[in-house]
Structures are given as structure tokens and as C-alpha cells.
Amino acid sequence: VNGMSRSMRAGAGLVGKAFAGKGGYEVRHPGAGEHVEAPLSKQVLVFAKGDKPFAIYPISSGKSSTPTVTGHFEFIRQEPGYNSHGMYYSFYFYGGYAVHGYESVPDYPASHGCLRTFIADQPEIYNRIFFGEDIFIW
């Protein structure tokens, strides 16, 4: 988020800024209480309470031929474990669109419309999301 690529390592200065709440991400919907944001231009999933982000994960959103829907949604359905499409611990927010783990999460839009996360991150993400929680995607 701080203009860094996924392969860069954060030095002490950047880590200190992040722990001081100055990590470089400005919450777009501070009046929404506890919620999730997905700014597709940054390819990240952000968990926030009011105007404070408390967790940020890298994602891969929908490619141009199968774009991710944008707008304001609520999480409506969950599916633990793997499904037949290789989606891991899915939490759906609109029809077949979900936040889910997947084996391939490049740093550019590559999915069929979902928000892909790393397999290792997804159980934590899945447990952070609650039914009816708002997600804002733009």
C-alpha cells in the first residue's frame, strides 16, 4: 500500500509508521463502522473499524474479460474448505462473487470476478468476516 510491490521488504522506518497507524492507507468509508474495503487499483482487501484499517491482505481481482463487480454489498453466504473449483474458504457477497483463497494470486487482476487471496491468509480472512458485514469495492 505504501507504494511497495509485493516482493519488496519493509524496513524499520516503514514498519514503525505502520504500527503507529500511519501505514499509508486512507479508509474510504469511515462512517461504515466495522467493514471491508477492496480498492481494485491497489489489489488489496482492507478490514477497517471506522477510519482505522486493522488488517490488509493482497488480492487478485477479476480480469478485464470477467471483472469484479463494484459497489456496496454485504456478506451473505459462506462455504468452508475447498469446493470443486479450487476455491478455499469462500465468503460470498453477491451471487457467485466471493472472497476466497486460491492457488494463484498474482499482483494483477486475474480471477473470474472473485477476490482471490493467498491460501495461507484465507482462514484468517474467513474468520474475520461476519454475515451482513459491509464490503465496498471500487
Stretch-by-stretch model annotation:
Residues 2-3, 44:
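Cell-envelope/ECM-targeting effectors and their regulatory/trafficking segments
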Residues 3-35, 66-73, 77-138:
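Exported/periplasmic cell-wall-interacting domains
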Residues 21-63:
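A structural motif detector for short, solvent-exposed N-terminal "entry" segments of globular domains
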